[in-house]
């Protein structure tokens, strides 16, 4: 029940934030960039990418067996998915490096004014961390490619990998700004399952047409609310504990 309550509070806070016009600016910047990249790649790269996929196994085997139409269709679908994924990664990178700090500063002042910035992060470390996590995500994606041909895995693996990407990128960067080392450790231990589930739910959004372009900004906003709500709860419990001990 606690897990679903935390997710419900996060959803409610996220929807409430959408009434703020400035929030939409933070959502649209990565969306427009991702859309621009997506359209360019679809126009100039989809054909060439599909041809290369046709020349590589297992599609090349399908062509050799005479299933040319099916191979072409699968090549186009695979190319479209790859381009959409790349556009999402670019949007996520821009969001995590440039938009998230501004978003945190804004909602920190407007909705979490009582929370103190207790972290010690700086812009350079955030940028390097985001690039490192995306590199690991791509590496995991490549290493698990053979599993995609196992029935059902092609649907499950992309969601799990993106859930991990969302969790690692946003949770750690938000905690780096607001939380002390002890607070980071406690929140990551106590809320891991909820945060991963949040990443999984938002990875579904990232795989939906059109909505996928808004996914980086929406994901950053939702994770910001979850982590800050968890931190607020943690600090409230700590204050209450001190007051009880003093009595």
Map each language-model feature to its residues.
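Selective recognition of hydrophobic, aromatic-rich stretches within alpha-helical transmembrane segments
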Residues: 73-105, 148-175, 210-234
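Lipid-exposed faces of alpha-helical membrane segments in multi-pass integral membrane proteins
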Residues: 32-37, 74, 78, 135, ...
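Membrane-interface segments at transmembrane-helix boundaries
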Residues: 4-8, 54-66, 90-127, 169-188, ...
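Hydrophobic alpha-helical transmembrane segments of multi-pass membrane transport/permease proteins
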Residues: 26-46
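A hydrophobic membrane-anchoring feature enriched in long, contiguous, low-charge segments
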Residues: 7, 11, 63, 67-70, ...
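Interfacial aromatic "cap" segments that immediately flank transmembrane helices
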Residues: 14-32, 115-142, 167-205
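Long, highly hydrophobic alpha-helical transmembrane signal-anchor segments
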Residues: 40-81, 118-142
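Long hydrophobic alpha-helical segments typical of transmembrane helices together
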Residues: 187-247
